[in-house]
Amino acid sequence: MNFKYIVAVSFLIASAYARSEENDEQSLSQRDVLEEESLREIRGIGTKIIGGLKTAVKGALKELASTYVNGKRTAEDHEVMKRLEAVMRDLDSLDYPEEASERETRGFNQEEIANLFTKKEKRILGPVISTIGGVLGGLLKNLG
């Protein structure tokens, strides 16, 4: 009788353990899906923000460029126009590539991924914004 009881309890414990392992695997796969969806949302928001900034800055730069085209240009004005054209090229190449593969992001949590995108934005936007500031400062100095 004791042997049957021990076998029955062992079987119940083994089946409960197997069910808990299966539930853990399902929970992990659901968590992976949620993390991937969050990552897509972060990328989408970043792309929309960058796209809006790019459009606004391009419009302002085109307006400034047309102002310079209509007036007489000195060597300094020509240099400013070259900088404006360089900024326009930088803005054209600023599009976010959707190349972040699952292998690259699988080991990161959401905060690390957000930090990576923030560092990338700072690395790209820093020089562009400083160049735009310098160009606008030069324009205001020349106009004033």
Swiss-Prot record:
Tissue-by-tissue expression: Expressed by the skin glands.
Keywords: Amidation, Amphibian defense peptide, Antibiotic, Antimicrobial, Cleavage on pair of basic residues, Cytolysis, Fungicide, Hemolysis, Secreted, Signal
Subcellular compartments: Secreted
Residues recorded as bearing Leucine amide in the entry: L143
Keyword Signal annotated: yes
Residues in the signal sequence: 1-18
Role: Maximin-11 shows antimicrobial activity against bacteria and against the fungus C.albicans. It has little hemolytic activity.
Similarity comment: family membership: Belongs to the bombinin family.
GO CC annotation, single: extracellular region
Protein's GO biological process: defense response to bacterium; defense response to fungus; killing of cells of another organism
Modification Asparagine amide, positions: N70
Residue numbers covered by the propeptide annotation in the UniProt entry: 19-43, 74-123
Gene source species: Bombina maxima
Domain of life: Eukaryota
Protein's name in the database: Maximins 11/H1
